[in-house]
């Protein structure tokens, strides 16, 4: 399953570390907070670029995988325009996206008030 603070899947983390950010990788390193956060944040930034900053798609891809989100975006069942998800067929991913977006919105409101 997913490892460390950023809950990275080992296969995805290995591919990303070795092919995109070109840093050392071992599954044990995923349990080192500094390494895990560094790799997880870099992966989120990578997904942000791949999905043109569309945070719904970025978060869905972080949770379910980039390939499956691309399939959803190419399906009229889940996307009317190929850029935005109208529906997410995985309940876990749908809940994840909603929770993260709700938490983000809460922090935006909190920091605007202060």
Positions of predicted regions on the chain:
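Substrate-binding/active-site groove segments that recognize
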Residues: 1-23, 35-43, 100
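Generic helix-packing signal
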Residues: 17, 44-45, 62, 104
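Surface-exposed patches in mature extracellular/periplasmic domains of secreted proteins
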Residues: 25-28, 50-61, 114
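Non-membrane alpha-helical structural segments and their capping/turn regions in soluble enzymes
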Residues: 30, 34-38, 56, 94
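A general structural signal for short secondary-structure boundary/capping elements
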Residues: 32, 52, 105-109
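Catalytic and substrate-binding regions of cell-wall glycan-acting enzymes that process beta-1,4-linked
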Residues: 57-114
